[in-house]
Amino acid sequence: EGEFGNFCAGGDIRFFYNAAISGDRDLDTFFTEEYKLNHLIFNYPKPYIAFMDGIVMGGGMGISQGASLRVVTERSKVAMPETNIGLFPDVGGGYFLPKCPGFIGEYLGLTGKVLTGQQALAANLADFAINSDGLANLWAILESKTETAQDKLEKCVQTIRLGSLKKDEGWIDTEIHSTFENEELSTIMRILEKSESDWAKKTYLMLSKRSPLM
């Protein structure tokens, strides 16, 4: 959990650019350490809770998707936006995006679409959605010095369940699966270009501004 309302927006793109141009070896060190951290989180033996409040993008997804419990709020903005700068979803995106229902992962990975907390819940990128005004109480439960770790964890989960919000599936257009089930990007673009639906037109324009590979 970062400061309430700000989880993690990912890496410093300006640093990446300057380091690549100058040949700074710190760039290699950064990615090595980042991926080691992601691997550690995904394999961590103890309960790991990610309070995904606010912006959760790129690297923020890398340190949250391996959590035992992923909690979003009404302020959450969840995305893997790498194609916006001509890159591809990294930090484990190739592992957790395919776990989304149907072909939603392919859609999110290629478009970089930003989801709300309840939309992320529908995409299996979160376990619970709650109102952000309940976060302070959850922290107080976890910081208690009078209960065992197991008791605190169970009480925290129970509190989250009682205040949980419903998932939002309204954004999942029926065309997502029939379009993004295709393995070739050229096929996806051709289908979108020929479609008359508003969703297809918006998605085509969106992809046209993403990675030059598209």
Language-model features, listed with the residues they occupy:
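A short acidic, glycine-rich active-site loop
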Residues: 20-30
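Hydrophobic, secondary-structure "cap" segments at the distal end of domains
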Residues: 94-103
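Gly/Pro- and small hydrophobic-enriched strand-loop and loop-to-helix capping segments
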Residues: 67-90, 124-138
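Amphipathic alpha-helical blocks and their helix-capping loop/short-beta junctions
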Residues: 125-213
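Glycine-rich beta-to-alpha active-site loop
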Residues: 41-85, 108, 112, 117
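A structural preference for short, pocket-lining loop segments at secondary-structure junctions
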Residues: 1-21, 40-51, 73-76
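Basic (Lys/Arg-enriched) interaction patch that binds polyanionic ligands
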Residues: 106, 110, 114, 118-132
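Terminal peptide-recognition signature
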Residues: 12, 47, 64, 120, ...
